[in-house]
Structure formats: structure tokens, C-alpha cells
Amino acid sequence: MALATGPGKQTQLREVEGVPLQAAIVDNWGQIQSFEAKPDDLLICTYPKSGTTWIQEIVDMIEQNGDVEKCQRALIQHRHPFIEWARPPQPSGVEKAQAMPSPRILRTHLPTRLLPPSFWENNCKFLYVARNVKDCMVSYYHFQRMNQVLPDPGTWEEYFETFINGKVAWGSWFEHVKGWWEVKGRYQILFLFYEDIKKDPKCEIRKVAQFMGKHLDETVLDKIVQETSFEKMKDNPMINRSTVPKSIMDQSISPFMRKGTVGDWKNHFTVAQSHRLDELYRKKMEGVSIDFCLEL
């Protein structure tokens, strides 16, 4: 099924088991599902606009023991393949991952039910970052405005409806977060919150390092905190997507690294929208004991 888009862009999403995805991903679905994970793979898992780039840089800095030069070896989007990524004729995320030596650090936005089965079968490590739904929606809205390969989001009012109905790329925020939360006790999953990393980055970075089996001294931890601050990353051309062509990401519309704050939703939501989403959250997340922070 193709989902309609706004008038500005001709991009359409198609669905896999009810989850909207970019057409190229759907066309490559067989290769994605048959992907062979390895037991020593670490998979970074996020819903879009939940701190993917941030946690990726943190993980890379930990892996490189805080060596900034080693983290400059390639653009961030090329260091750790995004497994479902597809844009022919370029190599797919699966092909890039297959060409990597072990141990591999990989990325995905897929919900649990669409993840290639080999990740579960090989008991891989998963690092999940969740962000509160209101800030996530705002960030995704601005990202879709500037991203030329995703559907036009329309007005904020229109996007609000699209998002709460799960008709955005990678589907429902509620299903995504709930799905990963519910399996975290059965697999090697470190479940983190964007807001906690913002509040106490050193504490959360230490958790990630321990999960990765890395012991870092305080000096290295402090360096990683400094190098992965929003301000540092926004000015880092290896991270800020400034090399991505305007035909793919038009940063004159909205920067890729926009604000990186907690509570920006208050600048976008009406009181009615906020109440409506609160009610929807209670209904959709019933039985899930997550208490998201909405402001710092």
C-alpha cells in the first residue's frame, strides 16, 4: 500500500506488515530479512529522531577509547551501517555490514517485529534509546521538512495527525517503544532514555561503556562527554551531515542538528494537542511502566 504525500515532494511510503517504510527499503526487504547477524554484533536501535546520531557517536568514542582522530576516520553515517538502508545503485546497508570485519556496530530504526530474526537467534547486544513522544514528534516534523527523500509533512496540524496515527516512516512511536521495552528482559538490551543522557551524560556514557565491556578512566569519560555535546557535534562536519547533497537534505529549511533539547514540544503543541496526546499515550502504553521526562 502506498501512502499519500504532500504536494512538495513526490516520495511515497509503502507498508510492510502495516509499518510504513521508504519504497527502496521495501524493494530490498528479502535481503534485509535474511541478514546474517553475528553473536558479537552490537545493534543501536532507535525510533527516528530519538538521539541516533548522538548515541552512535558516544558508542564510537567508547570503542575508540576517546581517540578523536580515530572517530574522524569517516563520516558518521558510513562508520556503522544502517541495516535497512537502501538507495540503489549505492551499496545497501546489508551489503555494507557484510563487508565489515567483526565485531560490528550496526544501526536500525526497525520495530522488534520487523527485525531480521538472526539478531535474536544470535543473542546479539542491543542498545536502545527512547525519547519522549512530544519532542520526538517535533524533531521528526522538522526532519521531514528538510529531508527530500521522505514525504512532505504538510502543516504542523496535519503532521500531528499523521504521526499519532503511525503513518510516518518506521511506523508508530508507541508500538516501537513498547515493543523494545517488552523484550528488554529476555535479551541483552540496554534501554536508555534521551532525557537521562541529556541530564547526566557521564553516568549514561559509563553505562554504555560497561555494556560494551569497556573500562574507561575518568579522564576519557570526561573527554567523551565534552566531544559528544550537542554544540561540539553540531560544528563537526563528520557528524552534522553538511556534506549530504541539498537534493537529499536541505539544511536551509531546517538544520540536521536542530536543537537537541528537552521540552521544545512546548513551542509547537497547542494545549488541546498536548492533552490529546497525553490521553492517547495512556491508552497505547497501558501496562508499560515508563515515566518519560518532558522537560528539564
Curated annotation (Swiss-Prot):
It holds the Pfam family Sulfotransfer_1. It is found in: Cytoplasm; Lysosome; Mitochondrion. GO terms for cellular component: cytoplasm; lysosome; mitochondrion. This is Sulfotransferase 1C2. 3'-phosphoadenylyl sulfate binds at residues 49-54, 131, 139, 194, 228-233, 256-260. Gene3D superfamilies: P-loop containing nucleotide triphosphate hydrolases. The gene is SULT1C2. It catalyses: a phenol + 3'-phosphoadenylyl sulfate = an aryl sulfate + adenosine 3',5'-bisphosphate + H(+); cholesterol + 3'-phosphoadenylyl sulfate = cholesterol sulfate + adenosine 3',5'-bisphosphate + H(+). GO terms for molecular function: aryl sulfotransferase activity; cholesterol sulfotransferase activity. Found in gastrointestinal tract tissues, liver and kidney. Substrate binds at residues 107-109. InterPro entries: P-loop_NTPase (IPR027417), Sulfotransferase_dom (IPR000863).
